[in-house]
Amino acid sequence: METKLFSPWTLKGVTLKNRIVMSPMCMYSSYDRDGKLQPFHFTHYISRAQGQAGLIMVEASAVSPEGRISDQDLGIWSDEHIEGFASLNEQIKAYGTKTAIQLAHAGRKAELDGDILAPSSIPFDEQSKTPVQMSVDQIKDTVQAFQDAAVRAKKAGFDIIEIHGAHGYLINEFLSPLANHRTDDYGGSPENRYRFLREVVNAVNEVWDGPLFVRVSASDYTTKGLDIADYIGIATWLKEQGVDLIDVSSGAVVQARISTFPGYQVTFAEKIKEGAGIQTGAVGLITSGVQAEEILRNQRADLIFIGREFLRDPYFPKTAAEELRTSIEGPRQYDRAW
């Protein structure tokens, strides 16, 4: 049976063999606290390549040490990180899977010793540390850190870069009026609150010519926050800057009640795709091949990001193919059982 899920997808010379993306998920397993890959990471990612993911996106990797969510996060703030990522990429690609990395800065949600940084000195919640409001120089340094990280990602052989602008981390904090109370050029109007992300995208584009994704949280789930209409506008700006795809998640810039259900974020991806005229990735409680196929067939999104289902089933693509009554090639070593 011919399916959309297992059809190739090409962008800027990068072709995915199918539309299944392993979503970036922090593993908090850089045990030496130096941001470097551990043996666990190789097993974790390569097993999903053997399982025939079209694209594997490495978890949020901090562009600076103070940009980690925890001190056991991966990092890409140093040239010392390149060798490990290059080795991982080589081994993943041996199975015909493309690779991406998510560049990130945790902002006020960093759980680290010492000062943490944010657009404004507003803690995430009552239990969280109060961040230091970033100076303009610190903002410029962070933009440079994203650019330097993109250079390292290119040297390490990644096919795609994603900028993490979601889940209440630094870029999301600048975008949302709930976390950004600045009165300078980086706060106030929507255009000013977008300025930091604009500068990050421009800086990355100066050194990166491959596909560029941005992950966003398309709703703050509160009446005083941003909603899908705001993010259609943001996605339009991103498209104008040359961003190729919006990876559409939601929430987490403030504490909020979120009613989840299968595919609960797909409607956001669909509305951004239609409203901004840009390709999108759908993510969030997508757990079956039939569900993924429906999203693609009805043109609600272009790629399917699979998160926790990949943790439960490293061979999710095979499972999905069987469900859709089609077949896919597996590793040659497994031919006798595939």
UniProtKB/Swiss-Prot annotation:
<dbReference type="InterPro" id="IPR044152">
    <property type="entry name" value="YqjM-like"/>
</dbReference>
<keyword id="KW-0521">NADP</keyword>
<feature type="binding site">
    <location>
        <begin position="307"/>
        <end position="308"/>
    </location>
    <ligand>
        <name>FMN</name>
    </ligand>
</feature>
<keyword id="KW-0216">Detoxification</keyword>
<feature type="binding site">
    <location>
        <position position="28"/>
    </location>
    <ligand>
        <name>substrate</name>
    </ligand>
</feature>
<dbReference type="GO" id="GO:0009636">
    <property type="term" value="P:response to toxic substance"/>
</dbReference>
<keyword id="KW-0285">Flavoprotein</keyword>
<comment type="subunit">
    <text>Homotetramer.</text>
</comment>
<feature type="binding site">
    <location>
        <begin position="164"/>
        <end position="167"/>
    </location>
    <ligand>
        <name>substrate</name>
    </ligand>
</feature>
<comment type="function">
    <text>Catalyzes the reduction of the double bond of an array of alpha,beta-unsaturated aldehydes and ketones. It also reduces the nitro group of nitroester and nitroaromatic compounds. It could have a role in detoxification processes.</text>
</comment>
<feature type="binding site">
    <location>
        <position position="60"/>
    </location>
    <ligand>
        <name>FMN</name>
    </ligand>
</feature>
<keyword id="KW-0560">Oxidoreductase</keyword>
<dbReference type="GO" id="GO:0010181">
    <property type="term" value="F:FMN binding"/>
</dbReference>
<comment type="similarity">
    <text>Belongs to the NADH:flavin oxidoreductase/NADH oxidase family. NamA subfamily.</text>
</comment>
<dbReference type="GO" id="GO:0050661">
    <property type="term" value="F:NADP binding"/>
</dbReference>
<protein>
    <recommendedName>
        <fullName>NADPH dehydrogenase</fullName>
        <ecNumber>1.6.99.1</ecNumber>
    </recommendedName>
</protein>
<dbReference type="InterPro" id="IPR013785">
    <property type="entry name" value="Aldolase_TIM"/>
</dbReference>
<feature type="binding site">
    <location>
        <begin position="23"/>
        <end position="26"/>
    </location>
    <ligand>
        <name>FMN</name>
    </ligand>
</feature>
<feature type="binding site">
    <location>
        <position position="215"/>
    </location>
    <ligand>
        <name>FMN</name>
    </ligand>
</feature>
<dbReference type="GO" id="GO:0003959">
    <property type="term" value="F:NADPH dehydrogenase activity"/>
</dbReference>
<keyword id="KW-0288">FMN</keyword>
<feature type="binding site">
    <location>
        <position position="102"/>
    </location>
    <ligand>
        <name>FMN</name>
    </ligand>
</feature>
<dbReference type="InterPro" id="IPR023663">
    <property type="entry name" value="NADPH_DH_bac"/>
</dbReference>
<dbReference type="Pfam" id="PF00724">
    <property type="entry name" value="Oxidored_FMN"/>
</dbReference>
<dbReference type="InterPro" id="IPR001155">
    <property type="entry name" value="OxRdtase_FMN_N"/>
</dbReference>
